[in-house]
């Protein structure tokens, strides 16, 4: 209690000093702090002068502050990457004299801050590394872990695509080296992030150094399952497969029912076909591993399978049998999209399932039961919870609509539309379709037009808009021109966005073997636009994008070379797994086998799928991450190719 009183007294005293003696601030630099050497548990004032930055002339500036710890922190799942970020939050700054300021109470548990500043449209990342605010001890010494912690907070997701971790790897490595020269014991606290930076900076030249560090960390008397997984994963990353297999074997011997064994056995669930096979597998699996963390998703998949099969009563019976066991909603919502109109009570069991999701999601939205994720600001976290509730309401509205209750469905879909702030393509489409069913053609048309112009589109939006157009005009004459105008506006905005993201980085050369055994080099396509699509057979979003990529390949076959680079492949027979996927789906793709992940690493790929677009001059011009949908992918490629051809 006394310590709390002292802190409150310090805060009151500090505020009084500001009011009495700090009537002016020094904004001579772009970024500074008061005090110059801040401490944990104290108030720090961030001072920012945007003159000469992208934020010069802003009417409002906000700061995003990322606080970090003095070590890598392991998430609940040992399979997730460690992360030393304690919290991320956004603060609106106050205008003062020639600049902006904000006062922040620094938590006791952190050793530094990283700050970025932004207005409504632009962000000052300080060239990608953020503004660094290390914390100091009461003796005015740099806190142990402050330097390595700063680098680690950037290695872990950085500032999204704005931080090129390959470009800045040497800089980040310098912070680790400074830290370890001052505090050698800290190397063990930052093993994961340090190895990541070392590998990015030195490539294969770092392997021996990483192995030496791994040997120092290997203590059989203190083996935990987490440590064995860490050792195996990193030996694998530096291409020492013998050691990687050794520690994997030791883990299976020491923890025969451990999380690693469970995860591998759980993979068999996704090879089963249909609700019956999947349920039989999960029943046996849960009897063996009752506490497996991934079972909730598998339960959701089973409910979804019943729905896709039209077995709505069985879906409900299985749902009821779960009692208080958790089940994932995503596969259920996905399955609901396949529900056809049945104007009777056959679908009513689905309403009871989805209503449970609506109730839980609304409670989480209004009063979350879990802490805010450390890498999300409060407003973004609230948007995430709002989207979860919106998807539950959207699913409820879809089923209600399929049962013929169009007016009731409109209520749910309208709330979903409002919760997602018009930014979710599926919700927008469904709301417009149900408005149309309720006779509100003008409102449906306005929603679809606004969504398409904003680049938020599903393939079915064009069909619905065409139906409205014909119903209003009496024929489809003129629709093509009308729709083209909408797409032109969206395309212009998309091109502006992509042009602002263009880079010019020399593309690393490579030679790989394709599925026919022929050697293929990047230099074979000199003077041509090349798209490298990094993927793997286990990657769901990669495979989901392939129908769209087939359309892109057919459209640009003569002017653009698309190479599908199979990397991070886990199949025992990699080549056969790739060939089977191509043949089963009739994909005419030119696939290169990156069996040693050398190209994956030389291009600094961190997730799958990633598309790297290389210009005619041999430079990397753009990177596209993940898969958001067919329309978005094709529009993005159209825009990039148009820019590079101009």
Residue ranges and their predicted role:
Residues 22-215, 227-253, 276-287, 313:
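Glycan-association/targeting regions that enable binding to alpha-glucans and other polysaccharides
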Residues 510-530, 554-555:
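A short beta-strand-turn-helix
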Residues 437, 445, 449-509, 523-525, ...:
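N-proximal helix/coil linker or "cap" segments that precede and/or mark the start of modular domains
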């Amino acid at each position: 209690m006394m310590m709390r009183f002292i802190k409150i007294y310090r805060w009151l005293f500090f505020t009084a000093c500001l009011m009495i003696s700090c009537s002016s601030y020094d904004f001579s630099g772009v970024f500074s702090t008061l005090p110059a050497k801040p401490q944990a548990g104290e108030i720090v004032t961030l001072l920012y002068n945007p003159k000469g930055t992208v934020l010069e002339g802003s009417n409002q500036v906000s700061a995003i502050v990322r606080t970090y710890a003095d070590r890598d922190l392991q998430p609940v799942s040992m399979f997730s990457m460690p992360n030393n970020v304690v919290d991320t939050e956004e603060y609106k700054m106050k205008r003062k004299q020639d600049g902006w300021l904000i006062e922040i109470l620094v938590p006791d548990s952190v050793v530094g801050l990283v700050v970025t500043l932004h207005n409504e449209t632009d962000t000052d990342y300080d060239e990608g590394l953020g503004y660094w605010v290390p914390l100091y001890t009461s003796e005015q010494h740099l806190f142990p872990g402050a330097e390595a912690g700063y680098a680690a907070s950037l290695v872990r997701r950085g500032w999204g695509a704005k931080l090129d971790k390959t470009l800045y790897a040497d800089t980040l490595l310098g912070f680790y080296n400074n830290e370890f020269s001052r505090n050698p014991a800290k190397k063990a606290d930052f093993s994961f992030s340090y190895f990541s930076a070392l590998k990015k900076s030195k490539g294969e030249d770092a392997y021996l150094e990483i192995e030496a560090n791994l040997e120092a960390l290997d203590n059989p008397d203190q083996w935990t399952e987490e440590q064995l997984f860490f050792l195996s994963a990193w030996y694998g990353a530096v291409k020492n497969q013998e050691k990687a297999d050794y520690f994997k074997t030791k883990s299976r011997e020491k923890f025969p029912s451990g999380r690693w064994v469970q995860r591998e056995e759980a993979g068999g669930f996704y090879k089963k076909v249909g609700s019956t096979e999947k349920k039989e597998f999960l029943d046996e699996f849960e009897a063996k591993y009752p506490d497996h963390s991934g079972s909730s998703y598998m339960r959701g998949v089973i409910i979804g399978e019943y729905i896709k099969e039209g077995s709505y009563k069985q879906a409900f019976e299985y749902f009821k049998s779960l009692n208080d066991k958790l089940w994932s909603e995503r596969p259920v919502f996905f399955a609901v999209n396949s529900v056809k109109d049945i104007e009777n009570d056959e679908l009513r069991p689905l309403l009871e399932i989805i209503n449970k999701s609506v109730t839980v999601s609304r409670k989480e939205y209004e009063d979350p039961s879990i802490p805010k994720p450390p890498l999300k600001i409060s407003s973004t976290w609230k948007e995430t919870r709002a989207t979860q509730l919106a998807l539950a309401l959207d699913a409820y509205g879809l089923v209600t609509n399929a049962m013929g209750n169009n007016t009731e469905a409109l209520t749910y879909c309208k709330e979903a539309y409002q919760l997602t702030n018009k930014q979710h393509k599926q919700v927008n489409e469904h709301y417009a379709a149900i408005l149309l069913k309720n006779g509100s053609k003008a409102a449906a048309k306005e929603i679809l037009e606004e969504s398409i112009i904003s680049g938020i589109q599903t393939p079915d939006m064009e069909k619905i808009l065409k139906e409205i157009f014909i119903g209003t005009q009496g024929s489809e004459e003129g629709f093509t021109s009308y729709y083209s105008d909408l797409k032109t506006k969206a395309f212009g905005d998309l091109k502006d966005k992509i042009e602002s993201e263009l880079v010019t980085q020399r593309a690393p050369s490579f030679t790989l073997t394709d599925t026919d055994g022929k050697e293929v080099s990047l230099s074979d396509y000199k003077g041509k636009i090349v798209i490298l699509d990094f993927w793997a057979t286990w990657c769901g979003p990669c495979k989901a994008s392939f129908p769209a990529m087939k359309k892109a390949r057919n459209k640009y076959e003569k002017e653009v070379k698309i190479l599908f680079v199979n990397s991070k492949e886990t199949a025992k027979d990699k080549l056969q797994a790739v060939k089977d996927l191509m043949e089963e789906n009739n994909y005419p793709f030119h696939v290169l086998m990156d069996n040693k992940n050398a190209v994956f690493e030389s291009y600094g790929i961190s997730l799958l799928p990633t598309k790297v677009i290389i210009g005619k001059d041999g430079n990397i011009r753009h990177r596209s991450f993940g898969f958001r949908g067919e329309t978005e992918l094709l529009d993005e490629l159209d825009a990039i190719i148009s820019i590079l051809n101009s």
